[in-house]
Amino acid sequence: MIDYHAKLLASLKEIGIPVHYEMTLYSGLSTPCISYMELSNVSTQAGDTLGYSRLQYQIKVWGTQISDLQKYALLIDKKLRPLGFSRVGCNEMYDNNSSMIQKIMTYECLALEQFD
């Protein structure tokens, strides 16, 4: 297992809007904003000194304007690509009660892990 949280968070924060861990979201946050959560972190290949882990993260853009969601989704792609991530899933969801729109994206990468 490899820990990519710090690299991912640093890249997302460079976008310039608030970034939150998905499990700590609460009502009343200012939007647009980004949330993230690790979906999967599994060892796919392992040797004596190194291995590979397949990582999946769910990244959401929250807002009330579809144009904001599209703009920030493209910026997220641009920031995560150099880390080796590619978008493997995407959908949108609207909440009638809050008038919030979510762009829900899944990113995946294969990460090299050095063993001590």
Predicted regions: what they are:
Residues T49-R54, L74-I76:
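Short intrinsically disordered coil segments
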Residues L74-D116:
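Acidic-leaning, charged glycine-interspersed low-complexity segments
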